[in-house]
């Protein structure tokens, strides 16, 4: 009798654990941080990738174009995967792509750009991650699309793909 009661309690506990585990695994865990679409981008500044000149973000958004800010690093595998998409996006003359090189070894980053091509009109160095933090980045790669007034139109988490390319290009029409 005692053995049966102990077995029943253990069985109920195991079933309860499976139910809790199943509920937890079936929850949607695709967390999307609050993006302030329609809000102005925080201003930032960083050193130019090629000449170390300090650039304020307000200097970058002067023409009547769509601006794509891409946070990347040479050590980031998804950044490598999306690079061909950025090269394709560069062909759209109404779009300027601004690269934010995140916590990277400058020598490796320059080698990456030389080897794979440079889709960026400007590249800023983000040595300590402060630019990415000010932009609300949660990881890399991340891509933020803004208009000339620095209003956030779209944000992509992770590597952009052909679908993202179409979405960004559609913003120019």
Q: Each PLM stretch: what is its role?
A:
Residues 1-7, 28-33, 58-59, 91-92, ...:
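Short, Lys/Arg-enriched, disordered terminal segments
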Residues 1-47:
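N-terminal targeting signals for export/organelle localization
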Residues 43-67:
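A short beta-strand-turn-helix
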Residues 65-67, 71-75, 139:
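Short pre-active-site segment immediately N-terminal to redox-active cysteine/selenocysteine motifs
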Residues 68-69, 97, 143:
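Hydrophobic beta-strand anchors of alpha/beta hydrolase catalytic cores
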Residues 71-88:
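Conserved redox-active cysteine motifs that mediate thiol-disulfide chemistry
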Residues 91-92, 96-128, 140:
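Conserved segment of the thioredoxin-like fold in thiol-based oxidoreductases
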Residues 114-119, 126-172:
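Thiol/disulfide oxidoreductase modules built on the thioredoxin-like
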